[in-house]
Amino acid sequence: MSQQHDYVIGKNAVIETLKSDRKLYKLWMAENTVKGQAQQVIELAKKQGITIQYVPRKKLDQMVTGQHQGVVAQVAAYEYAELDDLYKAAEEKNEQPFFLILDELEDPHNLGSIMRTADAVGAHGIVIPKRRAVGLTTTVAKASTGAIEHIPVARVTNLARTLEEMKERGIWVVGTDASAREDFRNMDGNMPLALVIGSEGKGMGRLVKEKCDFLIKLPMAGKVTSLNASVAAGLLMYEVYRKRNPVGE
């Protein structure tokens, strides 16, 4: 990224940043923000020797957009992982790889929400394309409520080629498509898996779709014909979690 820093906004996101290894340059809090989670921010900052600058809330409104909850931190720019980092994350846990592939996802709130769920289910990383897709931004960080500090995100030039390379390394590529015949509940979540989620409006691109080993669908029993990308991703991720972590074992 060209810029040297980003902003983290919101109490949860800043707390997770303070707990992580990310370099934090400055920390601002709105005057009289001392209750609840704000107190945890203050204690963590004190423990790390970080000085808090107390400013009028209007000052924070001018600095960033979005609901900052009276807490803003300036941090080192978000760094993208390498693909090998994702494999390493699976290897360190002695687990079969489980990756999320996001094909031209544009909504930062969707990306942040997917990151949050991916961390919750123990996925080993997310892959996004460099072009025509949202990257790691302040809005994404806020929507992830701190998951951005824990889930590695790799950014690649050619998503279809990356999927081909994954297949060569033994990963099964499963795409989501409304026209697919296979119900998502029949998916084998125990195999080395890359789950592809298409963009909000168009779904998966043709080249990406052609690289999939299987296509699955989410059955729709009501009147609507599609789900929000982050909702669909969440359902699919927890299906993989359910298969890998049977109740009672």
Swiss-Prot record:
Its EC number is 2.1.1.-. Coiled coil: none annotated. The keyword Iron does not apply. InterPro entries: Alpha/beta_knot_MTases, Ribosomal_eL30-like_sf, rRNA_MeTrfase_TrmH, SpoU_MeTrfase, SpoU_subst-bd, tRNA_m1G_MTases_N. NCBIfam families: rRNA_methyl_3 (TIGR00186). Belongs to the class IV-like SAM-binding methyltransferase superfamily. RNA methyltransferase TrmH family. The keyword Ribosomal protein does not apply. The lineage of its organism: Bacteria, Bacillati, Bacillota, Bacilli, Bacillales. One of its GO terms (biological process) is RNA processing. GO terms for molecular function: RNA binding; RNA methyltransferase activity. GO terms for cellular component: cytosol. It is an enzyme of class 2 (transferase). Keywords: Methyltransferase, Transferase. This is Putative TrmH family tRNA/rRNA methyltransferase YacO. S-adenosyl-L-methionine binds at G198, L218, L227.
